[in-house]
Structures are given as structure tokens and as C-alpha cells.
Curated annotation (Swiss-Prot):
One of its GO terms (biological process) is isopentenyl diphosphate biosynthetic process, methylerythritol 4-phosphate pathway involved in terpenoid biosynthetic process. Mn(2+) binds at residues 150, 152, 227. One of its GO terms (molecular function) is NADPH binding. Belongs to the DXR family. Its cofactor is Mg(2+); Mn(2+). InterPro entries: DXP_reductoisomerase (IPR003821), DXP_reductoisomerase_C (IPR013644), DXP_reductoisomerase_N (IPR013512), DXPR_C (IPR026877), DXPR_C_sf (IPR036169), NAD(P)-bd_dom_sf (IPR036291). This is 1-deoxy-D-xylulose 5-phosphate reductoisomerase. Catalyzes the NADPH-dependent rearrangement and reduction of 1-deoxy-D-xylulose-5-phosphate (DXP) to 2-C-methyl-D-erythritol 4-phosphate (MEP). NADPH binds at residues 10-13, 37, 124, 126, 211. The gene is dxr.
Length: 393
């Protein structure tokens, strides 16, 4: 039995992972679950999957869960705090780690899993955005297996040669990577109307079912910008080798353009259970519960270039990548502050890129050669961004 620990089991990726795991009880065992404070939801997950351990980041939520579980399944160990997350992913009973915590909060436990040599199903792109060099070094040194779960990077993984994955793109005969993006809910909205976009509108993605933070990132296309940075680290690519293509149908999840003129694409319905099942079963494949792709119903696939006036966050991400050091960390921190401020209705949708650009101009990046350096840049950028939100609000 393969022991699977899920970081962020109550989020959309975590729930999709459990849906896939439930189909194979003879092959996978849910070793540990974690959440921030969603007690009712994780309680139901505990009743169904009976993990050995559960971690609630919030101590009060952990105590509530402990009191609810003890009369029913007293054998489940409930703990709290960020350090407990590192404990479950490094446990000898954990073979695979689904890294699905959203944002910078997922960095430390995911890095711990890499250092422990686990198979990591990486849905937390911020781990690579913030500490790409450190993270990839940890994977290499420990012999960990790193499988991308973002649909785009999983598609690229499937379209790349199976041999020599560690080689740079030109050694694999790859000319460029084509990352597809839906364009989110506002790809055709008049620019003059974007000031008045509400959080609920921004979270209504036309194709994917996602959490609120990543839905806003999709609407601004910062999500695609972060994915560009992630792809650079995963595939040893330069920024100039990655092109973003708007593809509203979200059927082609990404493409690889080879030097001989061949372009390989991975297609499928927009359902995260596909890359999750691929990561769990690799190098094999297994049924995931995803609906059969009906090309006749889709009819046509369309593509266009992204408009950087409409999506300035994408340009900011490329600029941060080119600048190097902890600039990507600063970008991510400012974005997390900006998105939360927008969701809290403290700033406008169009102020998200303005706050990020403002923060990038005021926080000096350093060399990203240690975890303390990365965390320091993250903390400084958050403080600077939060102070500016207070001035605007």
C-alpha cells in the first residue's frame, strides 16, 4: 500500500485527490490530511478515509476537530501548527505527498518533503516561484520524485521525452514551450469596466473549478505568470523559451514545440483529476473518473496572443523572472497581499497589478541562495505591500 499525505485536503486540489484515491482503496492509503481551519469538512474526510494523522494549522480548529473525532475514531492523531505539517510529510509512513496548500504557506512543508526524498505531486507552484534553485537542489540531492500537477506543467511533462528529463531544453530537441491560458472571465470585458469588477465576478472562472485566490490570479493572469516561472525551474528553460497562448476552450493544456517542426500537445477536459491520477500512477496510467473528451461537441479550438495592457500581471512576472534573485519571491508576496485586499474589498481589481509593481520598485531583491534570504524578502515585501494597502484604503 502506498501512503499518501495531502497538504491542503479541503481545497479543490485536495478534494479532487481524495476523489481519485477513493477509486483505488487496494492501492493507496490516506496516511495524513491537513487543512487550515475547515473543521467540518476535514471531519467528514476523516470518517471516510481514516488517516493516521491530521494537522490543522490553526490550534483552535485542531482542538475542535480533536473533540469531534475522539468519541468516533480516537486512533486518529490530531496536531496543529506549521511544524506539524513537516512532520507528516517526512514520516516514513508517507510515500507520496500532494502539495496543494495555496501560496507561500506551502513552501516549508513542500521543501521538507523534497529533502526527505518523497514523491511530490506539486500543485503548490509558489514553492518553485519563491525558491526554485533551493527546491530543485533539494530534489536532486535527496532523489525525490517531482511530478507537476498544474494542468499546464503536467501536460508539458507528458509531451517531453521520458529520458533525460534533467537536461536543458535544447538537449531534448525542444525549441520552445507553449503554455496555454483561458484568459479568465474578463478576456473580452471592456478595459474601462475592469475598475468595477467584484470579487465574485473574478472568482467565476468560465472553465475550471478553483479556490478564490487562484481564481483571482487566473483573472489577472498572474497565475500564468507564476506558471512561467515554475516552468523555467521544472524544465530548465529560459524565459525567452516560454510563450503564453490564450486558448479559451481550455482543452489543450500546453504544447511543446520541437526543433524539427513537430508540436506535441496534451488535450483533455478541464478536470484536475487527470493530472492528479497521472502523478499518482506514473509511469503507469489509471482511470480518474474524468468525462470522455468530446471533440465533436467542442467543434473548434481557438488561439490568440495575450494583451499585456489587459493583463499587466503577466508582464510583471516575466520582468521579475528576468531580474532574478528573490524578485520572484517579492512578486509572489505582493500578489498574495493584493489579491487578499481585493477579496476583502479594500482595493479595486485594477489596483492588483499596481500594488505589485509598486512593491517591486521599493523592495530590493537579494541573492536567493538560502531559505532565510527567501523568507526575508517575502516578509519585507508583504510588509511594504500591506502598508501601501493601508494608505490606499
Amino acid at each position: 500500500m502506498i501512503g499518501v499525505s495531502i497538504l491542503g485536503s479541503t481545497g479543490s486540489i485536495g478534494m479532487s485527490t481524495l476523489d481519485v484515491l477513493a477509486r483505488y482503496p487496494e492501492r493507496y492509503r490516506v496516511q495524513a490530511l491537513s487543512a487550515n481551519r475547515s473543521v467540518a469538512q476535514i471531519y467528514q474526510q476523516c470518517l471516510q478515509f481514516r488517516p493516521s494523522q491530521v494537522v490543522m494549522v490553526d490550534p483552535d480548529a485542531a482542538e475542535q476537530l480533536r473533540q469531534r473525532l475522539h468519541p468516533v475514531v480516537p486512533e486518529i492523531e490530531v496536531s496543529s501548527g506549521s511544524e506539524a505539517l513537516e512532520t507528516i510529510v517526512t514520516s516514513p509512513d508517507t510515500d507520496y505527498v500532494m502539495a496543494a496548500i495555496v501560496g507561500a504557506a506551502g513552501l516549508l512543508p513542500t521543501l521538507a518533503a523534497a529533502r526527505a526524498g518523497k514523491r511530490i505531486l506539486l500543485a503548490n507552484k509558489e514553492s518553485l516561484v519563491m525558491s526554485g534553485q533551493l527546491f530543485m537542489s533539494a530534489v536532486s540531492e535527496s532523489g525525490a520524485e517531482l511530478l507537476p500537477i498544474d494542468s499546464e506543467h503536467n501536460a508539458l511533462w507528458q509531451c517531453m521525452p521520458a529520458e533525460g528529463r534533467e537536461l536543458p531544453l535544447h538537449r531534448k530537441g525542444v525549441r520552445r514551450i507553449l503554455l496555454t491560458a483561458s484568459g479568465g472571465p474578463f478576456r473580452e470585458r471592456a478595459l474601462s469596466e475592469l475598475d468595477n469588477v467584484t470579487p465574485d465576478e473574478a472568482c467565476a472562472h468560465p472553465n475550471w473549478s478553483m479556490g478564490r485566490k487562484i481564481s483571482v490570479d487566473s483573472a489577472t493572469m498572474m497565475n500564468k505568470g507564476l506558471e512561467v516561472i515554475e516552468a523555467c525551474w521544472l524544465f530548465d528553460a529560459a524565459a525567452c523559451q516560454i510563450e503564453v497562448v490564450l486558448h479559451p476552450q481550455s482543452v489543450i493544456h500546453s504544447m511543446v514545440d520541437y526543433v524539427d517542426g513537430s508540436v506535441l500537445a496534451q488535450l483533455g477536459n478541464p478536470d484536475m483529476r487527470t493530472p492528479i491520477a497521472y502523478g499518482l500512477a506514473w509511469p503507469e496510467r489509471m482511470e480518474s473518473g474524468v468525462t470522455l473528451l468530446d471533440l465533436f461537441a467542442i467543434g473548434q479550438l481557438t488561439f490568440c496572443q495575450p494583451d499585456l495592457q489587459r493583463f499587466p500581471c503577466l508582464g510583471l512576472a516575466y520582468a521579475a523572472l528576468e531580474r532574478g534573485g528573490t524578485c520572484s519571491t517579492i512578486l509572489n508576496a505582493a500578489n498574495e497581499v493584493a489579491v487578499q485586499a481585493f477579496l476583502d474589498q479594500r482595493i479595486q481589481f485594477t489596483q492588483i497589478p499596481k500594488l505589485i509593481e509598486w512593491t517591486l520598485g521599493r523592495v530590493t531583491p537579494t541573492v536567493a541562495d538560502s531559505l532565510p534570504a527567501v523568507l526575508e524578502s517575502d516578509a519585507v515585501a508583504r510588509q511594504v505591500a500591506k502598508e501601501q494597502v493601508e494608505r490606499w484604503y
